[in-house]
Amino acid sequence: MKLILITPPTYFVEEDKIITALFEEGLDILHLRKPNTAPMFAERLLSLIPEQYHKRIVVHGHFYLKEEYFLKGIHLNSRNPNIPENYKGHISCSCHSLEEVKEHKRNCDYVFLSPVFDCISKKDYHANYSPEEIRKAHKAGIIDKKVIALGGIDTNNIQQVKDYGFGGAAILGALWNRFDTCNDCDY
């Protein structure tokens, strides 16, 4: 089962050190998601992360960074829904319904399905699927190894994610809420 970490939406002091330590401890993939931020901040963060880990980083915006920093790939979402012209490489995308999963899974290396549980980072963002719906979707082949669970995943329910048949779990609030990320850093 893949373990994917999504960055918090803002930059913070020593974020690169935490990310590097997590890679050293076995983090599979990092999704660099910093909506509404200037690309120079992403460039700065990437320059501080050892190059050996760049091939395990996926960007949610500023797609040119994929080639410039030899990153793993790009992630499509509502802000950046289109594959760049002539793009070749890893693609993932966000899905918020089982119908979207069916639609996008065939064109992506994997897709996120959210929210699977009540979100930790977005307090009013509740689970969109019952356990029965998830099991039914797995049995129907909708949820499989190409579908990554997102939303409210922590140490208390990560085993459920595996048992449901997801290909992995994407973590956000369960990890980043343990750090003081509220201090924006002007790189």
Would you name each region that the model predicts?
Residues 109-117:
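Non-cysteine beta-strand/loop elements that form the S-adenosyl-L-methionine
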Residues 117-124:
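A short acidic, helix-capping loop that chelates divalent metal ions and anchors anionic groups
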Residues 93-96, 125-129:
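Short, well-structured alpha-helical patches and their helix-loop capping segments
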Residues 129-136:
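Glycine-rich S-adenosyl-L-methionine
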Residues 1-110, 136-139, 143-145, 154-168, ...:
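Conserved N-terminal beta1-alpha1 strand-loop-helix module at the mouth
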